[in-house]
C-alpha cells in the first residue's frame, strides 16, 4: 500500500558557521560537503530508507578498456530509472547510497550546497540529509506523477505534476505554501493513459523563464514569468532541455537518440548521435545530457525496454568534446545501476541558483 499525504515536514538540524572574512563562493561548492556523507554518524540505512533492490542482472564477463578513468572521472550523484537507488561517487568509488524501495522511478536528483539530496520518485519528491534524515516530503495526489524537480534557493522547489491537467508548481518547503501553480497544455485533459509521458524535465532559467520539453507533443516551449510562450522548437520526443550559459538550448531527443544544441533563432549549432560514436559504443535510450564548464557534454544512456540480462552490455554515459572526441565512457554495472541522470559535483556554480548548472 502506498502511503500518501500531501506534505510531511521534519525540522533539520541547523549548523551555523561563522566566517571571519567575506569572499567569493568556492568554484565547486559541493566538494566541501562531501565528507559529511562518510562521517561515522551516517547509518548504513536510514530510518525512512527503503530496502535496496537486488541486482538481478549478470556482471559482464569481459569489459573492454574504455576511454577515461571510469568511476574516478568525476565525483557525482547518480541515479536511473529501473533501479531505485541514488549513488554518491567520490574518489572513484560509491561512498553513499539512498534507496527508495520498489515501485516508481527516480528521474531527477540534486545535491544542494547544504549537503541535502533532493529527488523525485514518480509519486513523491523528497529531501534527505547526508545523515539519512528525511527533512521534507511531498506526495502527489492519486492519479498524478512527478518526474522533475529543481531547487529554487534552499527553501523552495519547482516541480511539475503530470496530471489532467499537468501543473507547474513552486512550493515553499518551510511553510508548505504553494507559491506558484499553473496548468500546462497537454495532449489530452481526460485520458489517464496520457499522464505518465507528459513531462520528464522542466527547468527555470537564470532569467526566471520556464523551459518545458513536451515529451508527447514533440516540442520545447519557453514561457515567460507570466506563462506566455516566448520560444518554441519542434523536435520528436524531447525528454530534457537545458538553457546553456551561451544562450543556446541543449535538447535531448529520446526518439532519435540524439542531443542537439539550438540557438535562440532555432538554428542547430551542434548535434551528437549514435553515428558519431566508434564501433562498439552503443547508446540506448538517451534521456538527459549535461554541458560541463570545460565545454564537454555528458550524455546518459538508459535501459528502457531492455531485459535484465541485456543491461550489462549497455553503456551508461559518455563524455564528448565539442569536436565529438570521446573522452569518457561509463560502463560499470558492478557498482552502479541504470543511468538516467547525474549531477557532477566538481562543477562550478550553486545548484539552487537557476541556470548556474547546465543540467
Give, region by region, the residue ranges found by the protein language model.
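Bacterial N-terminal signal peptides that target proteins for export
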Residues: 1-11
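Bacterial N-terminal signal peptides
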Residues: 9-19
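Histidine-/acidic-rich catalytic cores in large beta-rich domains
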Residues: 23-359
